[in-house]
Amino acid sequence: MTAYLVFDALKNRKIDIKQTLPVSERAWKMPGSRMFIDPKMKVPVEDLIKGMIVQSGNDATVALAEGVAGSVERFVQLMNDQAVFLGMHNTHYKNPEGLTAPGHTTTARDLALLATRLMRDFPDYVPFYAIKKYRYEGTPAANDTNRNLLLFRDASVDGLKTGHTQAAGYCLVASAKRELPNVGTRRLLSVVLGAESENARANESQKLLNWGYSAFDAVKLFDANQAVVTPPVWKGKQPVLKLGSVRPLVVAVPAGSAAQLKTQVVRPDPLVAPFAKGQAVGSLKVMQGDKALFEVPLLVLEPVEQAGVLGRAWDAVRLWIK
């Protein structure tokens, strides 16, 4: 979550990636894995991000939190607010670095949700997670290798983040991107919590990723900005309303079960202009047999302006007869 908020601050220009941040006494004295920065330094945001991600530097994490929010306490408030906004219902933060604290909790599902949103919302910063080695100039050469062993074992793996405390065990949120026949590029995430060692978490993560690619098919239902449905529109300058999604609609299903998929459009009727581009009008339910897998809003792909007086009057009569 610390990385998510830092990337959000960069995106919204609250901080700049080349900007230097001071290292407080609090950051300098952080226990656990560190980047080995000290209060005599002013460190660029870009290097602090690398220290946080590659070296799991608790000192870098606190320096970033203070740089974004002014204080660790305020940053933790932002973390919890964002967790609620993202739908991480079983997560509560007590600090930005992830060290054990009473009430500091999360789940595998919430971490998967956070990782998905981070990669979707901030794709320009995802390459940070694939960096294998990093050391800030003037600091010791210790702790300069990424602890995500899959980066060194599997060329398709490009992240994401390790974690370890005595209470939580060895944890890893891993991401992989592979080119598959007749499918194209497909990304999967895995979450392993509570493993007994670095090697164990890497092995279990590898098993999960391989299983995900072999046991499930990715089925593209519609392309981005493709009209899913074109219902008639009343009192408008155009006869139909094009509804779809700005993202490709892709669903993962057990291998060989794609033929069971079906879609159901839920929308108001009649549809009376005007309609603005991007306006939500109904939804698309994706079903597998009688089971609803998920539901996405249908958005207006092309605006429909209101017709002139005569056109509206004519459609009013037709609606009344209907």
Protein language model features and the residues they cover:
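Domain-terminus/edge residues, biased toward the C-terminal soluble/receptor-binding domains
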Residues: 89, 100-105, 109-322
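Active-site-adjacent loops and short helices of periplasmic peptidoglycan-processing enzymes
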Residues: 1-109, 115-123
